[in-house]
Amino acid sequence: MRAATVTVAGALLAALALAPPARADHQDLTPPEILSASFHGGRTLVLGPNQTLTVQATVIARAPVGITRYGVEVQLFGPGGRVWHNPDLPATCEPINATTSVCTEWFRIDTGSAAITNGHAGDWKMWALVASNNLHTHPESSITTERDLATVKVRRASKLTFAAAPNPVRQGRDVSALGRLTVADWETGAYVGAPGQTAELEFCATPCRTVEPLRTLRTGTYGLTGTTHPATRDGSWWLRYGGTAQYAATYSPGVFVDVLEG
């Protein structure tokens, strides 16, 4: 964490400069401190094609003289040097006591926008600026910036289909399992096949108590994958995809396979 001067603060201070000064009865020159920060509650952002989502960035900060009402700015730094910020949506800080405030800024993400490409998928780092009520009287000590406050995981949505046949099947005979993995293409606005990905064929006997991994599969052309495996008991079969730094993890719907004795 470090204190920053007005000259490096960014768009936030340009707006604050036009606002009337907040009263600072106790001229304590201690810079503000960022206590915690989160983006989307720490959850992974999973986005499909042509999807619009508004998410919240939260920063909790304190200063001896309090945090000014509009004293927060949040940016995300991501893959390929990309920067994500939302200057058009309001950011505010609400006090919870005389020194501490909860600051929020809203980010509107539209994967149908030409500004969003598939390269935006990945891990982003959260940066924040906070300003105390000393901003107008002692700007040199009223601002703090901090980077790497949180990791924001942005993933392209994934889908898995799955089919198993024959069903019912004689005990000991092979079941043919076929699936397809598709992922959101934010640039074309559709789901497309994802070749070269790893998926797990899993099984749980009836009644389901323990999931059994059966086989590791790899997707080929158009995201298709398949295998055969002997059926020994009634139960449900499905595919599980663990995801990557670009694609979200997902499961296929389960298929119950009835196994006939003899």
What kind of region is each of these model predictions?
Residues 31-49, 146-191, 256-261:
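Beta-strand-rich domain onsets/edges
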Residues 142-155, 219, 226-229, 246-257, ...:
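Short Trp-Ser/Thr-centered turn/loop motifs at beta-strand boundaries
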Residues 1-25:
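Secretory targeting and sorting signals
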Residues 118-140, 233-253:
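Enriched for extracellular/lumenal, surface-exposed ectodomains of secreted and cell-surface proteins
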Residues 102-121, 227:
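Signal that preferentially marks extracellular ectodomain short beta-strand elements
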Residues 66-79, 185-213:
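Short flexible loop/turn segments that cap and initiate beta-strands
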Residues 51-69, 75-81, 132, 183:
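Extracellular acidic, Ser/Thr/Pro-rich low-complexity tracts
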Residues 99-105, 210-229, 235:
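Glycine-centered loop-to-beta-strand initiation motif
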